């Protein structure tokens, strides 16, 4: 993915409901082109916990949702299920199959935010991701961001503020070329300053991101932008039929740097079909 300063196109960043089946499969490098899968890194990836049953509200406090966290100021993670009438998308005449189990999560509930999880990783291993994504009101785009756990958790300075990952997607939208309306981009590499408190970065003056590493931009991130319509789930990475056939058009691998024992997997809105920031992309089966 080329990074160009003259790329100015920006999709309206909004809510994404993301139904994604994202498998993160670490592969130990044994020899050239020889890898062995060891375990799933992401937990509660199907968002089956906590179970809905007869709960009317689709929102759960993050501390009640195993393994996941959010940067939302209200600390709520929004779930969907046919049991609470929150089918996704809420349209007639389209397939409403849920990729795995009976629940999924909504990336943004009442505000734009990032849904994320820390995984224990082994330096030198390569992890592969796979996900199923779907728009809600039309074509929605999400960002998948993988990189090193920081000394400070990602955070928003206010309800309408931008956390570090959201700021990263803003930068990508201004500097990356080759963004497709549908499907998944090639892997984009971004370097940033270290995270600080309240959505800020260390020495948070000037640009927080760069296309190249330096003594200032020390944190390396891999970013993928994925766009899908609301008519059917789109399968990406290891969930794609192209992956099974051995002809995936992009890399779905993340190489863990030596010594990196904690890795963050973050999911945030890149753009949505409507201007309503409480509607967007579905996530499931990670």
Model-derived features with residue positions:
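Extracellular carbohydrate recognition
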Residues: 112, 242-248, 270-286
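Short beta-strands within extracellular/lumenal beta-sheet-rich domains
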Residues: 104-125, 247-251
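Beta-strand acidic-aromatic groove motif in beta-rich domains, primarily in extracellular
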Residues: 57-60, 115, 137-149, 278
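Sec-dependent signal peptide cleavage junction
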Residues: 24-36
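Extracellular carbohydrate recognition and processing domains
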Residues: 159-260
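Extracellular beta-strand-rich recognition modules
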Residues: 47, 126-135, 142-144, 201, ...
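Extracellular glycan-recognition surfaces and repeat-rich motifs
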Residues: 46-103
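Hydrophobic core
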Residues: 16-24
